[in-house]
Amino acid sequence: IRRDSIDKERYLIDIQDLNWIRVGNSHEWRIGIRREFWGVTETAHRVDILNQTDQVESFDGEDKLGQPMVNFSLSKDWGTLDVYALLGFRERTFAGELGRLRSPAVINTDLAQYESAADYHRTDFAIRWSQSYQDLDLAISHFSGTSREPEFRLMEHKGETTVVPFYGLIDQTGLEVLYILGGLAVKFEGISRSGQSSRFSAATAGFEYTQVGILGSRFDLGWLMEVNHDDRLPSSPIALGTRFTFNDLYDSQILSGVLWNEQSGETSVFVEASRRIRECCKLSLEAIYFNGGHAGYDGYRMLEYFDQDDFLRFEFIYYIGN
């Protein structure tokens, strides 16, 4: 349950995880509402498509809405095969007129449009194969259905022009690769998608190198770098960051970094920190700073709308039953 004293578009009642699970010798049935994450990279989640993004909750796209689904999972020597029937569609959340972060134009979610005649009642389908080969993890997936990422259209409503989301039908094939070599983790995820105007590809690749027990302590320090590419954009950012792990009883860690677009000069600096409190609670902090880049640059800017905005979230979680 979420309420907001300023922006009513943040109001939310959402069941995120509620499942019936039946386990067999080499298979599982999972029926209910779930959140399931696909992907291996940190700064962009290309293949993660089953759940809708709760965009008003966080800028990075990692917060998701629960998705009603039926999932059959089969585990064999040749890998794990998951088949999904996704029952109904969840619309993406957008900030209202008084909310942040948002685009200059308020998105009218009450007038959302769909390519499918079934609107938000459509059942979508997905399949994913994954396998581990010693130090190598692979996954191949395919999704067919209503895109979780809307396009935006102008329409006349009550004598005024308004911006509405349009959810088209897509087919998306994804690839995930994770290779571990000692303290080095090499990561890649990419997609090819058809159905939104023309086919396009997008990918994120990079590495994370972890120094274990720095300076003879129990602390670990990870260094990460990722590059991004999207056929739809003239340029994409490079990400540099660090992950500091305390290796204590409370799973304390700090992830920080910067996304930098060489062409436009745009940057965003982010910090994510979390720590458990005993067995009952968890504290987390998320902060993002935006910089608009070169003053004389007149090309496409990914962060143009956020130049005057920054983001800070502090969260306290209490786990019922502890």
What is the role of each PLM region?
Residues 207, 306-322:
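Outer-membrane beta-barrel "beta-signal"
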Residues 21-24, 33, 73-76, 130-133, ...:
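Residue-level signature of outer-membrane beta-barrel architecture
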Residues 11-16, 23-25, 64-68, 75, ...:
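Residues that define the transmembrane beta-barrel architecture of outer-membrane proteins
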Residues 6-14, 42-48, 94-100, 151-158, ...:
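Outer-membrane beta-barrel translocator domains and adjoining extracellular loop/strand segments
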Residues 1-101, 134, 288, 292:
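Outer membrane beta-barrel
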Residues 181-262:
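Detector for outer-membrane/organellar transmembrane beta-barrel domains
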Residues 1, 31-35, 83-87, 140-144, ...:
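Transmembrane beta-barrel strands of outer-membrane/channel proteins
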Residues 26-29, 78-81, 135-138, 183-187, ...:
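Repeated loop/turn-to-beta-strand initiation elements of outer-membrane beta-barrel proteins
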